[in-house]
Amino acid sequence: MKIGVFVPIGNNGWLISTHAPQYMPTFELNKAIVQKAEHYHFDFALSMIKLRGFGGKTEFWDHNLESFTLMAGLAAVTSKIQIYATAATLTLPPAIVARMASTIDSISGGRFGVNLVTGWQKPEYDQMGMWPGDDYFASRYDYLTEYVQVLRDLWGTGRSDFKGDYFTMNDCRVSPRPSQPMKVICAGQSDAGMAFSAQHADYNFCFGKGVNTPTAFAPTAARMIQAAEKTGRDVGSYVLFMVIADETDEAARAKWEHYKAGADEEALAWLTEQSQKDTRSGSDTNVRQMADPTSAVNINMGTLVGSYASIARMLDEVASVPGTDGVLLTFDDFLAGIDAFGERIQPLMRCRDHIAPVTREVA
């Protein structure tokens, strides 16, 4: 099973709590995180894109770097780890994304890929006059299908004459082309999102579910298998989890309860409000899960809380779920968390027994 890190491109990572570590996103922080991840043989690093935050006492995600420029910088200071940036497709023409991706492919020596998102939070785009109207909620995967077709044309042949409802290419050119086939990933949990991934993506990201229920996402992975069977393609699931680890289960649980007790209710209310704006996509979208009050303090990603041995055992359970190709990890404290993962958790994982133990780097 592959291991990735979801780098904190926005302030405070993924904990919407006044009791969680409070920090701003910087290149130096993300550089340290990704270089540590590479040192411990993580397979990939991904950054999201967020153009407007949730506010509240913690100003959650009000402060964000930009994904492509951040990952270009990280590509230049790493040598092995795969690097993925996220394209907010409403804001960037596909021909520009194709050229930026080809550039970062050159910087990274073929280690780059693109995560495509349709956009769900209207204020991110409305503030720039770029929101196409609420009907977009129902047509966004039609838009994305045309978008990825243009990308594949340009990466594959260097030329596109695509004509569609959303994009018109007139002998559009991109050169140089990527040195390797460009990986495209998506994060679809709705039926439309999974159908898109089955047809066009190399991997599909999905949320883990619950606290210390590592296989609860299995029905989602099964749906992805079924969707991919219809297209005859192999599209594995990468599952998002937060790791909160300590020496003992009790110590880790105490941290988790402390974070929950400091939940930023104002920011969470904003998330809930935005999640209700999409009345066209059904009840199975990522944002609906994010706003569920069960564990909203970390946007309801799957959460693994326990001792280092307990975390290793639960991650092995994740790996046992059919269709699972990898996990995308966040941490309550990224730098300490990645060290703990590399030194204390990964060596105990059966699904990572091909990785030689690594000690902490000497500063």
UniProtKB/Swiss-Prot annotation:
It is an enzyme of class 1 (oxidoreductase). PANTHER family: ALKANESULFONATE MONOOXYGENASE (PTHR42847), ALKANESULFONATE MONOOXYGENASE-RELATED (PTHR42847:SF4). It catalyses: uracil + FMNH2 + NADH + O2 = (Z)-3-ureidoacrylate + FMN + NAD(+) + H2O + H(+); thymine + FMNH2 + NADH + O2 = (Z)-2-methylureidoacrylate + FMN + NAD(+) + H2O + H(+). This is Pyrimidine monooxygenase RutA. It comes from the Bacteria. Belongs to the NtaA/SnaA/DszA monooxygenase family. RutA subfamily. It comes from Klebsiella pneumoniae (strain 342). The keyword Zinc does not apply. HAMAP family: RutA. Its EC number is 1.14.99.46. The FMN-N(5)-oxide reacts spontaneously with NADH to produce FMN. Requires the flavin reductase RutF to regenerate FMN in vivo. GO terms for molecular function: alkanesulfonate monooxygenase activity; uracil oxygenase activity. InterPro entries: Luciferase-like_dom (IPR011251), Luciferase-like_sf (IPR036661), Pyrimidine_monooxygenase_RutA (IPR019914), SsuD_RutA_monooxygenase (IPR050172). FMN binds at residues 49-50, 115, 124, 140-141, 190.
